[in-house]
Amino acid sequence: MVRRILSVFLATALTWGVSACPSALAQSAEAGYRFSPVNQFDVKLMATYWNPIVQYVSAKSGVKLHLKIGRTSTDTTAYVLTQEVEFIFSNHLFSPEREKLGWKVFGRRNSPAIRGEIVVPADSPITELSQLKGQEVAFPGPEAFIAYKVPYAQLLNAGIDVQVVFGGNQNGALAQLFAGKVKAVGGNSQLIEGYANRERRQFRVLWRSEPYYDLALMVSGRVPEKDAQAVAQAFLGMHKDPAGMAILRQADQSVGITDPIAFVPATNADYEAYRRFYQTAPQQLR
């Protein structure tokens, strides 16, 4: 099976206000902590979405957060695995091995459940998954749970061998689709809908997974409880503050989300569907 990485992103990781050096111990609130959301969009759009939110949370909590984003979702997840960050927005840590790292869920967005999808342009001659056999199919990256692992598992289980192409994030994968370089895309239903709204594109959904909760806000066990609670309360209270709600609406609009979204409390128990996936997933995706 051919795998190739599309070089469509910046060659170096982008970090706002932080050093790239790993930290073995939790920093003080005065020094600040690193916050890494998974790359759901290109780097520029990620910054547009998250910078105002991070600035609000820092000011409201009194705990300085610095946005740290890699050029791809794989790079950003690597920051987590090497303990370079203390707060994350991710769904990449629910495999049995990664749960041992001790990250704690404290929130999520109250968006509708997300699903893995395999899509083609609305005018594509492809109408069934079986027609993808031997074709190139783009995914955001090997770490993307909803957009890669879930739909690719479906293809593997159905015996449909495709050539995997990684686009670095959802936007990159979809750009390859409309450039005619791949026949289909595996994706996150929320991100595909947002892309369709922003770019005025239409899709045909060939397959859709069971529902999963949106990505989780998580904190490392290395962060003192006082700081963890202050940051959590700032995130979870944003929608109750007119200034915070305005920032959330602006962020939603920047990525094509039409319904108002807020951060709400969540726990590790809310992500049981992710754990079930790993119990039966093809070995190469565990």
Language-model-detected regions and their locations in the chain:
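Positively charged n-region of N-terminal signal peptides that target proteins for export
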Residues: 1-4
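Extracytoplasmic small-molecule ligand-binding "clamshell" domains
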Residues: 26-93
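Pocket-lining segment of extracytoplasmic ligand-binding domains
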Residues: 124, 135-233
